[in-house]
Design a protein with these regions (language model features):
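Metal-dependent amide/peptide-bond hydrolase catalytic core
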Residues: 1-147
């Protein structure tokens, strides 16, 4: 049975912005190879969640944050430039600036964006606020750069 109409959707996430071009081209090629001759096939390809691509400047800024955490708070701070899935809002900021953009330095917890399971670890509030303030101070006073 062939339905009168059908719709399909997909949420595509990529590691690099340039990967969208390749994927869109591949999907367009598949759409051209229509199996049902009288069918009307349309493709709407939207780039909704850009990836956050690491730069040398963002890596340097992350290392500075790790040093503050280790040297001043005696704690490790996980930071890497490996893709962690999802689509961070930080990626939108990185598309519009040449300054480094880093993420994953927010409050620790679990269940992000869930209706009834999200929580924050209270013990993470003070050190993360300290880190944020110190990063702003160090950038403002030239102790570290953002280029």
């Amino acid at each position: 049975m062939i339905p009168a109409s059908a719709t399909a959707g997909a949420d595509v996430r990529v590691l690099k912005v340039a990967d969208y071009d390749r994927i869109e081209q591949q999907v367009n090629e598949r759409v051209k190879k229509q199996l049902v001759p009288d069918a009307k096939v349309e493709l709407k390809f939207e780039r909704r969640r850009p990836p956050l691509e690491a730069t040398d400047a963002s890596r340097a800024l992350a290392k500075h944050a790790q040093a503050i955490y280790k040297d001043e708070l005696g704690r490790p701070l996980g930071a890497d430039d490996k893709a962690a899935g999802g689509g961070t809002d930080a990626a939108f900021a990185s598309l519009k600036t040449k300054a480094p953009v880093i993420e994953r330095f927010g409050l620790q917890g679990f269940g992000a964006h869930t209706a009834d399971a999200e929580y924050v670890l209270i013990d993470s509030i003070e050190p993360r606020l300290y880190l944020g303030v110190r990063m702003v101070m160090d950038i403002a006073t030239g102790k570290t750069t953002v280029r």
